[in-house]
């Protein structure tokens, strides 16, 4: 998918954040194998973990200021309005009720992302929500200032709250690095203790004591999400490492279990280590076909239980059942029926069935999706974050995408691979432009291609959406670093138009293209094994996906970024076709030339000027899938030579200059990108993770020296970075007249916080989140010292 957050995650030595996620953002993977059982048995529950930092080892103020620079949100943090008022007002009352209840389900489900972020994230959310719910911001501001807090520090407190609410936790949805407040611990504590919530509710003080050190902790493990000892994750218990994930994933593959809906906790029972694979569900009891009793595999013990996120999923299902009453047709009703069963039982098959009804629901007035969808933030690349969205179809803007779909089967022929590497038949998807009412999770994308289930996408179909009111918030005013004045002018004029083209091509013909070569349980191949050649080597095909293997499980840690790179490359490559640009309304050759140039320039600029923010120089890890993908494409085009791309340091330690020779895009650029794209597709089709990893790691390398010392230049890029936009979303409510009302908010820090206060107008949700943390804390002893 194509995320606008600039476009929101590579962890560990396997650069994990790069797991397949079909969306476009705004802004060495080992194959699964059996590991010696001694690894598991030698790791007790509290075995030699790097603990969270605590108050005794926090840096001193001067050191802290420098250390936190990359982790704070500035007081100038921009907030923008996700405007959907006119689109919402055009709905019928029945449609508004459907949108309202589905939005409620999405918001409640989106809170699961807090639990999936860090052990402390739900408590930080609860602390801040209780504080702002108890009194108006101007009242709290007056009390804080009277207590000696500066106006700037109070603003920093508000900005931190915005960051936690917007990212569903205290780690960035785009990049997975920690967010810490841009004010001192002392001033933060002063504000908390000045609040009415602190005075009136004893539990607020208790919550604060639990999280105050965790809020500011910036030891190396706290800086990013990932496996111990290099990061924090809640998809796995504290004592799980990359090696544990390989043990668990090997067992899951042997059982044909996809891990989208689960977390894994390594516990000790009766002196034995057990991997408890826990499914998200309302039900907790055992059920044949879903849970599994304790069993041994390769010397390790496993079981599947359920009941994770129970109370939140109960709320989700209650709202979905209300939405079902206002469904427009059988497709929507059946879709919801299966979603409810999925969340009740912890059944991935039921969610797949719901997704099948969803793809049949062509051209709905209201588009929705909900569930455990995207796998960016799991260090192992398989467990999915919960999200849900509700949006209204913009028929006028959708027309161009419909034409793209109608011609897609022919347009795919422009891609550089041969027919055997393409799907047997093209399944025309729905492709619409939407105005988002609700997008709950750790960030808001600009475009989406779902479902992510391989067997449905390849054999049954999928949908693409472009989120128009998200695209409308692209910044076209501020200076653009590292470009000439002429290029800045062109970028500002054509960036949105070019981005819309890239979104469309990335989603429909990027994620929507290509075939996976498989052998099934009966030994039947889904491709002509005798006559299909490897386009890279010219030799017969010798690798393919085995029964039980999926792209996700095979490509694991690099999968997300690798797939985003493939889709981005498809977008660039096909944007050279003028008949495609005409579909988007660009018929004048001079305008087409500018669209092509700006599309290529923009992606290359993102790859060199923005992406490096998402590289961690300590761990040498990429922290974000799309950023790594763009850096890789930039390196491919830079290495193509012949003056196509040039990057030079114009002011030592201060500035860079990027130039792209537009006269060579259609020649040097086309060939270099076509050759690279062919390799990307061949390695994906043939499940050749070894060749894919070798190539991808080469282009992902951030050099310390040489003609392009990217590691050194990263500091220059960080000095020029701009904060990512936070989008304030409307709320819906049913009035006394039983009609749905839309409530919008000012695009300010105060307005954004108010939207969350009114979204949850009492502390019930805080009680619920706190109870989940209490239940789970035994799995995360390093956070809670238990």
From Swiss-Prot:
Which residue spans belong to the Extracellular compartment?
Answer: 130-594
What the protein does?
A: Degrades neuropeptide proctolin (RYLPT) by cleavage between Tyr and Leu residues.
EC number assigned by the record: 3.4.14.4
Q: Which family does it belong to?
A: Belongs to the peptidase M49 family.
- List membrane-spanning regions: 109-129, 595-615
Question: Can you name this protein?
Answer: Dipeptidyl peptidase 3
Per UniProt, the enzyme's principal EC class comes to hydrolase
Residue intervals annotated with topology Cytoplasmic: 1-108, 616-786
Which reaction(s) does the protein catalyse, per the Swiss-Prot or TrEMBL entry?
Release of an N-terminal dipeptide from a peptide comprising four or more residues, with broad specificity. Also acts on dipeptidyl 2-naphthylamides
The catalytic residues are 507
Keyword entries, A-Z: Aminopeptidase, Cell membrane, Cytoplasm, Hydrolase, Membrane, Metal-binding, Metalloprotease, Protease, Transmembrane, Transmembrane helix, Zinc
| Gene source species | Drosophila melanogaster
Annotated Zn(2+) binding sites = 506, 511, 564
